[in-house]
């Protein structure tokens, strides 16, 4: 971090700079960094297949489970009659990327938290749908340029080594 020359009359002591660097590193280490979401490939492939996005979750999902609840043939021995629990179980089955284990049914704050997570993931999908196509072509250009440069370097090394081998063969014949 640098000082402002028009505010700071003297040089900032190195101790302060080091302390700021340590605080920044400490805060950066505390940030929970997660790898790329495991279903990004699925989101990208979604354009070609059926729409399985979170936005397709409608009241039909909830009513479907109300119907299943009343279907005694489909009930299991440990069947839970709570509509909200059924809804969360179906949500968990259809959208495994959302961890619903921390949500407690019948509490409005927890349901709103699920809505927040749902909105956040929808935002991620929108960003991937709109921004990724713009950046992928640039990434391929950079990758192709890198591969061309690497191929040129390898070819030059190959030519140089062949020349050295030929020189060595000529030297051996002279001996």
Swiss-Prot record:
<comment type="function">
    <text>Involved in pre-mRNA splicing by stabilizing the NTC (or PRP19-associated complex). As a component of the NTC complex, associates to the spliceosome to mediate conformational rearrangement or to stabilize the structure of the spliceosome after U4 snRNA dissociation, which leads to spliceosome maturation.</text>
</comment>
<keyword id="KW-0507">mRNA processing</keyword>
<keyword id="KW-0508">mRNA splicing</keyword>
<protein>
    <recommendedName>
        <fullName>Pre-mRNA-splicing factor SNT309</fullName>
    </recommendedName>
</protein>
<dbReference type="GO" id="GO:0071006">
    <property type="term" value="C:U2-type catalytic step 1 spliceosome"/>
</dbReference>
<keyword id="KW-0747">Spliceosome</keyword>
<keyword id="KW-0539">Nucleus</keyword>
<comment type="subunit">
    <text>Belongs to the NTC complex (or PRP19-associated complex), composed of at least CEF1, CLF1, ISY1, NTC20, SNT309, SYF1, SYF2, and PRP19.</text>
</comment>
<dbReference type="GO" id="GO:0000398">
    <property type="term" value="P:mRNA splicing, via spliceosome"/>
</dbReference>
<dbReference type="GO" id="GO:0000974">
    <property type="term" value="C:Prp19 complex"/>
</dbReference>
